[in-house]
């Protein structure tokens, strides 16, 4: 149903956000921005 689709989409978005946050953190830590 629609709710399961939304949940899947939410998980996907959360993964992408977490990945980009980790990337920017690594960038700041290593100074390789």
Curated annotation (Swiss-Prot):
Q: Which GO terms describe its biological process?
A: defense response to bacterium
Name the organs or tissues of expression: Expressed by the skin glands.
Per its database record, what is this protein's job?
A: Has antibacterial activity.
Which GO cellular component terms, listed alphabetically, does the Swiss-Prot or TrEMBL entry include?
extracellular region
The family database entries (Pfam families) matched by this protein are listed as: Antimicrobial_2
> Mainly resides where?
secreted
Q: Which UniProt keywords apply?
A: Amphibian defense peptide, Antibiotic, Antimicrobial, Disulfide bond, Secreted
Task: Report which superkingdom the organism of origin falls in.
Answer: Eukaryota
- Report the subcellular localization: Secreted
Protein name (Swiss-Prot/TrEMBL): Brevinin-2LT
The record lists its disulfide bonds as: 27-33
Q: Which family does it belong to?
A: Belongs to the frog skin active peptide (FSAP) family. Brevinin subfamily.
């Amino acid at each position: 149903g629609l709710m399961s689709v939304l949940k899947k989409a939410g998980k996907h978005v959360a993964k992408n956000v977490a990945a980009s946050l980790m990337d920017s953190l690594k960038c700041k830590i290593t100074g390789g921005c």
